[in-house]
Amino acid sequence: MSEARHNPVLAGQTAVITGGASGIGKSIVQRFLEAGASCLAADLNEEALAALKQELAEYGDKLDVVKVDVSNRDDVEGMVDRAVQTFGQMDIIVNNAGIMDNLLPIAEMDDDVWERLMKVNLNSVMYGTRKAVRYFMERGEGGVIINTASLSGLCAGRGGCAYTASKFAVVGLTKNVAFMYADTGIRCNAICPGNTQTNIGVGMRQPSERGMAKATTGYAGATRSGTPEEISAAAAFLASDQAGFINGETLTIDGGWSAY
């Protein structure tokens, strides 16, 4: 990602990234730092945050890390407050943290799975977006919100029931916020990755046989898996002034899988 260093499109900006210690979130943190931004990386995994801080030590005080449970409203709101206190401002928030559901179709899903997915994948995005909009409105200078949805937020057969519902809701929230606040200089967009080489599926110890068969229809041989770096490049573009007239959009990054 060294090309970002030669094109510091986020110089002088401050970004908050949830799920920032691994996978797509970690790549976004690194990409944004290389593009000149200061970053607050938030994650539930303290060990991973410490490792991230050590790995990116060259950025010094431009990188702060904080343990956050994104399903907890106070944690999310405190995260934004910390960024403002540490860096003096917040210009960008990336609501990226998320979990999967073992590709469970509705008949195999219990209430606990549904409620957990909604808390982490949807409520967290609402908390972060609401806090950001309130801050941006008070500051009066606009701002950028990027929500990590999924191909499953556009194509209903690519994931489990709870995961798909949560990501469709993220897309709807994104578009509503974009329209409601377009006249304030606030931009709100979503990235929709397809299959990507991250650890989000680590918890899927026993994926549903039916769900797996249905969700992967049309995938075999159609395209390779994406890399976190390919997703973070799209996020950096949306965060920059180069995307200044892009608002309320869902940017699909899936190598063509959704064309099936």
UniProtKB/Swiss-Prot annotation:
Residues of the active site: 163
Alphabetical GO biological process terms: bile acid metabolic process
GO MF annotations in UniProt: oxidoreductase activity, acting on the CH-OH group of donors, NAD or NADP as acceptor
Broadest EC class assigned to this enzyme: oxidoreductase
Record key words, sorted: Lipid metabolism, NAD, Oxidoreductase, Steroid metabolism
EC number(s) recorded for this UniProt protein: 1.1.1.-, 1.1.1.391
Region forming the signal peptide: none
Residues that bind NAD(+): 43, 69-70, 96, 163, 167
Membrane-spanning residues: none
Catalytic activity as recorded in UniProt: 3-oxo-5beta-cholan-24-oate + NADH + H(+) = isolithocholate + NAD(+); 12alpha-hydroxy-3-oxo-5beta-cholan-24-oate + NADH + H(+) = isodeoxycholate + NAD(+); 12alpha-hydroxy-3-oxo-5beta-cholan-24-oate + NADPH + H(+) = isodeoxycholate + NADP(+); 7alpha,12alpha-dihydroxy-3-oxo-5beta-cholan-24-oate + NADH + H(+) = isocholate + NAD(+)
UniProt superkingdom: Bacteria
Family: Belongs to the short-chain dehydrogenases/reductases (SDR) family.
Function per UniProt: Involved in the modification of secondary bile acids into iso-bile acids (3beta-bile acids) via epimerization of the 3-OH group through a 3-oxo-intermediate. Catalyzes the reduction of 12-alpha-hydroxy-3-oxo-5-beta-cholan-24-oate (3-oxo-DCA) and 3-oxo-5-beta-cholan-24-oate (3-oxo-LCA) to yield isodeoxycholate (isoDCA) and isolithocholate (isoLCA), respectively.
Protein name: 3beta-hydroxysteroid dehydrogenase 2
